[in-house]
Amino acid sequence: MPAETGHFDHMTAGFVGIPFAVVVFAGHFSAMIVLLGLAVGLFVGLTSIGGGSVLTPMLILLLRIPTMVAVATSVVFCFITKGIASYQHMRQRTVDRASAISLLWGSLPAAVAGWLTLLMFRKIDILHGNVWVNREIGFALVGLGACILARDNKWISRLRAVENQNSAVVRLKLIIIGALVGFMFSTTSIGSGSVLVILLGVFAPLDENHVVGTSVFYGFVISAFVSVLQFTSGNTDWHLLGSLLLGAIPGVVIGSKLAVRAPKKFLRVCFSCAAISAGWKMV
């Protein structure tokens, strides 16, 4: 047991070291952005709601970061912050690898298609491209808010109860879900967390722990893949990313420890209302 704990500590230290390395490379950081990262990290730790859906609209609406830069930076942010959680779920054996693989079969080509779409907008007309992505983010936030509000409703469990559990049918549905989420995540940095949890809860024959674990692992893999794509397009703001991570990683750790006492349902409702409001402004 001590060996495992020590290994986890080394692994965690490696992820924590990433933002410091980024900041050293970038040359400076902003205290305000570090505090923003801390707030996002705390919320993610308290509620398990994905970082992209919280961070991206804040970057666009509050900091006035260009849309495509905000999306690319949020994608890399998700990759790093979900790495620690993904490793922990793997240790706890709460990742259903078959479901994750089916999701990725649909997601990887769809993510490439989304990245090519952003690249096309950037080369042809970046102004209209930002407007298009803004609207997509707006619709995604409204949909996400509605999904989270519906999360505790009884119709979800009734819908799942009548689902055909044939493995081939479930696999096909997961591939389709993966394609939809992969394209949305690649173009908006939203969807790999809360939206996927809702969809897996309805369409996948998994218990709640495996739904969360599989979603986190999937989010880590797809964000790693999209991060590589975004790196080649040069949209990531490394100064911004390093400052955000300096606050976010300790925020996630603190939020996770406080999560047991947190009023999760109340926080989800507050986030849903904020997401719908922010999304409406961006449509």
Located regions from the model:
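Juxtamembrane transmembrane-helix termini in multi-pass membrane transport proteins
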Residues: 50-100
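Interfacial segments of multi-pass membrane proteins
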Residues: 55-69, 195-210
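Juxtamembrane transmembrane-helix boundary motif
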Residues: 1-36, 61, 67, 90-181, ...
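Transmembrane helix-bundle signature of multi-pass membrane transporters/permeases
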Residues: 71-79, 104-108, 215-220, 249, ...
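Transmembrane alpha-helix interface/packing and boundary motifs in multi-pass membrane proteins
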Residues: 37-48, 179-189, 222
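Transmembrane helix boundary and interhelical junction motifs in multipass membrane proteins
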Residues: 48-55, 189-197
